[in-house]
């Protein structure tokens, strides 16, 4: 039985001037997704996708590299201004934000959307190092 030819979808050049940057910074990784106003993903990157492994993924430098990569992809689509939504407790929050600003985006607003429980689930046990 012959395999069907796999079609490669060409990425269309959209002309989007403003969007939303979702920065999800966990203890282990930092993921950045840039979407349009409706929430459709335009560009994404993460520290792991940029080649960092293990504990190096959680560093501010890895977050900066991932944000620069994501910004470059979004600027190819004509994006100029961003709203930034930061989520999570990780160390890459501020450095990713600075990298987006340094890439030439006009940042209109910064929102922290980290979920905070109103005494919900029991938290993890404290680490003893």
Curated annotation (Swiss-Prot):
GO aspect biological process, one term: translation
Residues annotated as signal peptide: none
Top-level taxonomic group: Bacteria
Molecular function GO terms recorded: rRNA binding; structural constituent of ribosome
One Pfam family named in its UniProt record: Ribosomal_S11
GO CC, alphabetical: ribonucleoprotein complex; ribosome
Membrane-spanning residues: none
Sorted UniProt keywords: Ribonucleoprotein, Ribosomal protein, RNA-binding, rRNA-binding
PANTHER family in the record: 40S RIBOSOMAL PROTEIN S14/30S RIBOSOMAL PROTEIN S11
Function according to Swiss-Prot or TrEMBL: Located on the platform of the 30S subunit, it bridges several disparate RNA helices of the 16S rRNA. Forms part of the Shine-Dalgarno cleft in the 70S ribosome.
Oligomeric form and interacting partners: Part of the 30S ribosomal subunit. Interacts with proteins S7 and S18. Binds to IF-3.
The family this protein is said to belong to: Belongs to the universal ribosomal protein uS11 family.
Protein name (database record): Small ribosomal subunit protein uS11
Species in which this protein is naturally found: Rhizobium leguminosarum bv. trifolii (strain WSM2304)
Gene field: rpsK
């Amino acid at each position: 039985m012959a395999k069907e030819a796999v079609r490669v979808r060409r990425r269309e050049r959209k002309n989007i001037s403003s969007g939303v940057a979702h920065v999800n910074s966990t203890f282990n990784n930092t993921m950045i997704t840039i979407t349009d106003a409706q929430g459709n993903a335009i560009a994404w990157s993460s520290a792991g996708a940029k080649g960092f492994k293990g504990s190096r993924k959680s560093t501010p430098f890895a977050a900066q590299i991932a944000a620069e990569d994501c910004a470059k992809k979004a600027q190819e689509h004509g994006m100029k201004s961003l709203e930034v939504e930061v989520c999570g407790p990780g160390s890459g929050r501020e450095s990713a934000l600075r990298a987006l600003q340094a890439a030439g985006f006009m940042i209109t607003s910064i929102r922290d959307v980290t979920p905070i429980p109103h005494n919900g689930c029991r938290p993890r046990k404290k680490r003893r190092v």
